[in-house]
Each structure stands twice: as structure tokens, then as C-alpha cells.
């Protein structure tokens, strides 16, 4: 299994992924915070269900592809674990309602993570608008020039069926999504471009860029949405 790391000065870089590289990343992060510079003790699992069965954890952080957020969150909430889930909270409105109800029943602490909203720039923008420093805001334009959204796309499902990379449990990765053969068009990273797995540019980067606008201007829920495309 591989994952893609993005270096804005050098472009895309492909690195090994999977259970063991993830474990080493966690251990090196903790080691950097210790005077000894060493840390061992992170147990890595392939299946989140096995983790929840075996480990007496207090909280769960979910940072998986969009289409699996809800099923993992529900499994954790049923065991009354605190949950921190990255945006978007779920893949659909129906899932969001289910997760919200489960959280109420569990009586635990939950939060949707959005680092775009948590950064200092978002706070500064909100303070500027609240202070009236730029007057009344009547119109907002938000766009993205993120290069990873211009990576190769497909008009339909690719016909090739290459072998599943070593270390990748493809059935587990698919989770609740309709089954399809593995292809690098879906994973890693570009699952965001497919409706069965991701929520598109709006759900991916829009959650970061639009959240500050909605919060600063106290807009509430959208009343209408219009979309257009060139193809």
C-alpha cells in the first residue's frame, strides 16, 4: 500500500503506507517529544473493529476516506468512546443524522475536526469582520487552485484490474461502498474524485474555505445552491 505526500515546493511524492509505517510515524512523533528521543509501544491494527474489541481506549480519532467515517464513528459510539472525526463528518446527511443521534445516546464528547477553521488565519478573519474593520461584507468569492485536484481523472470506471498492492485490504477499504476491483484511479488519494468514496472539491476543501465565511458572517444554513460545469 502507498500513500501520497504533498510537498508544495517539489510536488507529489509517493511513500510506503500501511500498518507498520503508520506505527513508526506515531512512535517517531512521540519520541520527538521525549528527552530520550525514543518511544516504543504503539500497537497497530489493520481493522478498526479489532482495535475496538481488544483495546480499552478512551477516544477514537477518525481520519479515513469520507465514505468510511460514519461506520467507524458508529462503532466507536456504540462502545461509548469519545470521537474526534475529521471533516466531512459523514458522507451523507442521512449518516450525519444517525451519528448525531448515536452521540446523544452515548453521552460522550464528540468533535468534527477542521484544521482550516482551527488555524489562526480563520480566527483573525472573524475578528476583522466582527470589528467592522472592512465594513459590511456583501459578497464573498471562494476558489481553490489546489494542484492535486488536477491529477488524472477518468470519464468512467477504468477497465484494468491490476493486483491489489501488498498490505492493502481492499474489501475493508471499500467498507460500505459498492464493490469494484482495485485500481490506482481510486486509491491512494484520488478516491476524492469518485462519488462512491469522496464528497468532491466542495466537501474536501470547501469545508475548510467556506467554514470561516459561514461562521464570521453568521450565515446559518444555505437556502439555495447552484452548480455549473464545463463537462
What is each residue range found by the language model?
Residues 1-81, 85, 94-109:
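N-terminal glycine-/serine-/threonine-rich beta1-alpha1-beta2 phosphate-ribose binding loop
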Residues 38-40, 56, 133-136, 221:
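Short loop/turn motifs at secondary-structure junctions
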Residues 54, 149-151, 181-183:
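Short, solvent-exposed loop/turn elements at domain surfaces
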Residues 61, 138-141, 174, 226:
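Residues embedded in well-ordered beta-strands within globular domains across many folds
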Residues 67, 82-86, 90-172:
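A contiguous active-site-proximal alpha/beta segment in oxidoreductase catalytic domains
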Residues 72, 95, 121, 209-212:
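Alpha-helical packing segments of well-folded alpha/beta enzyme cores
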Residues 163, 167, 171-231:
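Rossmann-like dinucleotide-binding domain that binds NAD(P)(H)
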Amino acid at each position: 500500500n502507498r500513500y501520497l505526500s504533498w510537498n508544495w515546493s517539489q510536488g507529489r511524492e509517493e511513500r510506503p503506507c500501511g500498518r507498520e509505517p503508520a506505527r513508526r510515524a506515531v512512535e517517531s512523533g512521540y519520541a520527538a517529544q521525549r528527552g530520550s528521543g525514543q518511544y516504543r509501544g504503539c500497537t497497530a491494527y489493520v481493522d478498526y473493529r479489532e482495535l475496538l474489541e481488544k483495546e480499552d481506549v478512551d477516544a477514537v480519532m477518525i481520519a479515513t476516506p469520507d465514505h468510511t467515517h460514519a461506520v467507524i464513528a458508529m462503532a466507536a459510539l456504540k462502545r461509548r468512546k469519545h470521537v474526534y472525526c475529521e471533516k466531512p463528518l459523514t458522507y451523507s446527511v442521512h449518516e450525519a443524522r444517525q451519528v448525531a443521534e448515536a452521540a446523544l445516546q452515548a453521552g460522550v464528547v464528540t468533535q468534527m475536526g477542521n484544521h482550516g477553521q482551527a488555524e489562526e488565519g480563520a480566527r483573525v478573519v472573524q475578528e476583522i469582520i466582527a470589528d467592522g474593520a472592512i465594513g459590511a461584507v456583501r459578497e464573498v468569492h471562494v476558489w481553490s487552485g489546489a494542484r492535486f485536484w488536477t491529477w488524472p481523472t477518468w470519464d468512467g470506471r477504468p477497465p484494468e484490474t491490476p493486483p491489489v498492492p501488498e498490505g492493502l485490504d481492499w474489501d475493508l477499504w471499500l467498507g460500505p461502498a459498492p464493490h469494484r476491483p482495485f485500481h490506482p484511479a481510486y486509491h491512494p488519494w484520488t478516491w476524492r474524485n469518485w462519488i462512491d468514496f469522496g464528497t468532491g472539491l466542495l466537501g474536501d476543501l470547501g469545508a475548510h474555505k467556506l467554514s470561516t465565511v459561514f461562521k464570521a458572517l453568521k450565515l446559518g444554513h444555505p437556502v439555495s445552491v447552484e452548480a455549473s460545469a464545463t463537462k
